[in-house]
Amino acid sequence: MPREVITIQCGQCGNQIGEVFWNRLCTEHGINPDGTLRPEAYTFNDRKDVFFYQSDDEHYVPRAILLDTEPGVISHIRNGPIKELINPENVYIDSTGGGAGNIWTKGFQCGEAGFEKIVEIIDREADGADSLAGFSLTHSIAGGTGSGMGSFLLDRLSDRYPKALLQTYSVFPNTTADIIVQPYNSILTLQRLALCADAVVVLDNTALDRIITNHIPNELLTNPFEHVNSLVSTVMAASTSTLRLPGFMSNDLLSLVSSLVPTPRLHFLMSSYTPITSSSLNVKEHTKDQEAGSGAVAGAAAGATRRQVHTDSIVQLVKRLLHPTNGMVSCGRDGKYISLLNIVQGEAESNQLYKSLQQIKEGRDVKFIDWGPSNMQMALSKRSPFTNEAHKVSGLMLANHTAIRKIFDNINNTFTQLFSKRAYLQNYIDSMVTGGEPEILEQFTDAQAVCTSLSKEYEAAESKDYLEYIGM
C-alpha cells in the first residue's frame, strides 16, 4: 500500500519550486496538465498515489497545499501550465495580502492568524490519505513567509501529527546577504528545523548559483531563479523516485529517512546530482532560425552540451556524486560521512550497484564515522518511460556529513554580527503581538543556543566518543 506524502509549499520560493516539481512529476507519471492520464500511462507500473490522488472524475490531483502571505506567485500558478491540476481548496493566502516584508515574526504571525483555515486544509488532505507517511515542506529560510510561516507550520505539524514524518527541502541563503535581515530569519528558522523536523535536505543558494554558472553559458542564462528552481525540483524528483518508481530499497519515506538519520539531531542532509543537463536546469532549446540568427548563442549551446556528463559506469557516477563540485551545499567535505545513500536511475543492474558499492568502500574516497557502521547504500530506481534523457544513468546522493556544521557556523556568525549591534530589530519588535522587545530578544538568544549546540553535535560526531557525548 502506498504511503502518501503531502507537500506543503510555503512562501515565494517554496511555491515557485513546487510549481516546477509538479510539472516534472506529471511528466514522469504520464499525467497531462489537466490531470488526465496519457493513454500509454495506464499500463505503467508506478505509484502515483504517493503524491497524487484521483478525484471523482478520475483526474489526478497533487497532494499539495499552497500557502503564502501575498498573492503574486500563487496567482501565477493559477494562471500557468498546471492551473487545472491544483485543488483550489488547498490554497491559502493571508487575508491582508501584504506579504511578510522579509520579517520572520510577520510571517509567523500570519501563520497564527490563519491557523484555523490552514489546519482545516491540512486535516482534510491528511484524512484523504489511506496511510499517511508524512509531510514535505518546501521553503526558504531567508525571507519572511517561508521562514516565519514555515516555522509556525513546523511547530504545529510536529505537535498535531507526531507519528507523521516531517521532512523539508530548505533553501539556505547566499553567504553574502541578499536580504539584510536574513541572518535573523535564518537562525530563527534553523531552530525549528533542528527541533521539529525529522529530515532536512539543505539546498544552499551559494552552491546552486555556482552550479548554474558552471553549466550555463552567459548567453543562455535567461533567468537564474528559473534555473535554480529547476535544479531543486530535479533533486526533489530524484530523491522521491524510489517512493514513486519503486525498486527494492527505500520505497517509503520512513525507510528513506531512517537509513540516513542515526540519531534525532543529526538529520541535516546534503545532496549531489549528476549529470547536470539542460533539462535539469531548464535551459531552453533554440530553433534553427534562432541559431542562424545568432551563431554565438548556437556555439554556446553546443558548448553546454559538450560539458554534459555521459557515463555508463556506476563507479564513475558515484565518484562524481562524491565530488564537492556536484554538491548542493558549499561546505566542502572536511570531516566524516555519517550515512550515505546513492539513488541510481536508468539502465543499471543490481549486481552493478553491488560491485560499485564494494569498490567505493575499498577505496579511500569516503571517510566514515568511527562510532557506527560504514553506512553507504545504493538504491536502484527505474526511469520513467515518458522522459527523454540523453544519458543512460543518472544519480542522486543524499548524505549526512559532519561538514554541514560549517553552514550553521556561517549563519551563527552573520547573526552575531548583526545582533551585537541590535541592528534592524524594530520591525521584529513591532510585529510581535505580545511580549515586545524582551520576548524577541529571548527568542533570538534561544535560537542561537540551538544553532551553536547543533554545530557542536555535528563536530562531536566526528569523534569515536560521540555516543557518550549524547548520553547513549
Swiss-Prot record:
List the SMART domains hit by this protein, alphabetically: Tubulin, Tubulin_C
* UniProt keyword Cytoplasm present: yes
Keyword list, A-Z: Cell projection, Cilium, Cytoplasm, Cytoskeleton, Flagellum, GTP-binding, Microtubule, Nucleotide-binding
According to the lineage, what is the superkingdom?
A: Eukaryota
Q: Which CDD domains match?
A: gamma_tubulin
Family per similarity comment: Belongs to the tubulin family.
Q: What is this protein called?
A: Tubulin gamma chain
Protein's organism: Giardia intestinalis (strain ATCC 50803 / WB clone C6) (Giardia lamblia)
